[in-house]
UniProtKB/Swiss-Prot annotation:
Thiamine diphosphate binds at residues 79, 120-122, 156-157, 184, 293, 373. Catalyzes the acyloin condensation reaction between C atoms 2 and 3 of pyruvate and glyceraldehyde 3-phosphate to yield 1-deoxy-D-xylulose-5-phosphate (DXP). PANTHER family: 1-D-DEOXYXYLULOSE 5-PHOSPHATE SYNTHASE-RELATED, 1-DEOXY-D-XYLULOSE-5-PHOSPHATE SYNTHASE, CHLOROPLASTIC. The gene is dxs1. SMART domains: Transket_pyr (SM00861). This is 1-deoxy-D-xylulose-5-phosphate synthase 1.
Amino acid sequence: MSDRPSTPLLDNVQSPNDLKGLSDFDLKRLADELRAEMIWTVSKTGGHFGAGLGVVELTVALHSVFDTPRDKLVWDVSHQCYPHKILTGRRDQMLTIRQKDGLSGFTKRSESPFDPFGAAHSSTSISAALGFAVARDLGGDSDTGHGDAIAVIGDGAMSGGMAFEAMNNAGHLGKRLIVILNDNEMSIAPPTGALSSYLSRLYAGAPFQEFKAAAKGAVSLLPEPFQEGARRAKELLKSATVGGTLFEELGFSYVGPIDGHDMESLLSVLRTVKARADGPILIHAITKKGKGYSEHRADRGHATAKFNIATGEQVKAPSNAPSYTKVFAQSLIAEAEDDPKVVAVTAAMPDGTGLDLFAERFPSRCFDVGIAEQHGVTFAAGMAAGGLKPFAAIYSTFLQRGYDQVVHDVAIQRLPVRFAIDRAGLVGADGCTHAGSYDISYLANLPGFVVMAAADEAELRHMVRTALEIDDRPSAFRFPRGEGMGVDMPDRGTALEIGKGRMISEGNRVAILNFGTRLKEVQEAAETLSQRGITPTIADARFAKPLDEALILQLARHHEALITVEEGAVGGFGSHVAHLLAENAVFDTGIKYRSMVLPDIFIDQASPKDMYAVAGMNAEDIVAKVLTTLGVEVLSQRA
């Protein structure tokens, strides 16, 4: 590949141990090569981009100073782990990242000993690193010895309450723990010029306790008339290390802010911390997301498709239909135009959920609560109790983080919070950590909840309207990542009758009851089955709760077999259907019932179609399920 950058130093790095013999000057050169290598790699594969570019120098410095994997390096979220993977023996696999049978886009314990703790969701690193620190002190890791525990967490992730819960606990325990705050959005504070740089170097240049003692002792040595002024000056100096007061109150020593792209400063501070820290310490590093390529873009290259390095133009397949996310956003905007009580909540995902479009139109009615799903859910519940009509747009996988609030603050009080659950089902390149596999199960078991799933983008538009009109209890509607089916779209949604499904086509012998966007696969399966002389009845449930009991019982009593299909785990729609059939003694009549759900495994990253193939839920799998259920020989199987 002739466009690959020249990387003579990086070419000799097989593991972090190879960094130990490099001079500080060569470590800086290595960082430059590593950044060029990452830009080239992601231009070929796509992936999370900006975060990794922002921590190149930090990654090199950490692996140079510390002894990984003996020292446990825990990356929060781990969007920024690409440089780390390149330095830890996975460079030759980077072109497989986020692809089937390739490297994960996140840290993953089963992938490398240099990934001591997996991640993908936010704000977990300090808790995990503290766990490693306690295990170290109690002799829990006899295989790799007792090393340092280092958490690298971004300023965005610090908006998650779990991070502060961990810091509070760490400060109480007093264990030697290193937290690096990677501040790449200037949301806490930028460095404050030469004074800040001097204070950071001074703090790193002497033992921490000596530094603090000197600061306290110096005041008492002054003549009495000058002591009050000196105390004020000391407080001013303390405030110059912006953010330090908060972290010190939590029990952490504080260093910073420092320039996270200045290799000399990073190495100096990290070496001093390694040599002298005797309790929890936080290093505040200021970095630029997208450093070296995309730092001037509005999103700083958070995630990207394959792209042309010279022009930045992304290589994307042409769109055949609007995305489900965009349909949701446009539908909600249309409803909000007519109803001033409609408000929207997102947990740090305005672009991903489409609420950036809503915010442009209704800035005072859209609330980004940060990475705080627990707060976001209860905040929405409070607005509902106050007479507003909140839509909480949250990915299925992230709604898990606010489940107690869904139960305690929303469901028990029957508050009409409307949950727009994006990324339902299997999501592709982000793999199992972002799959929306469980929301049907964990919502449909709650009394009073209305749970819907859109079979296509037109149905989604109707479900937005339906949720708006449900004003006496909570509701949820789920939809997948990606583009819709290309169906004709109504200008506005029409409220659906609660708990009523729809017949798609009538046949005989077997009925297939769909819930969600597998409907297209069901219809393709029916076409194949028709060539075998089998014409299934197809119905779309629309609702997992309340069930359309009349429709389900009719299908069961007039067919030899009933098969449900859903993009969720066991315990969801199919389980509720089975319970209904059992309670109505339908199984006593000999009905053959099968439920097609996601298997009891975590499915690694691949294309959604490949992931559903692993799950056994594509059209050919539905065909095979129908034939085996009816006792008809399956003529061929996939290799």
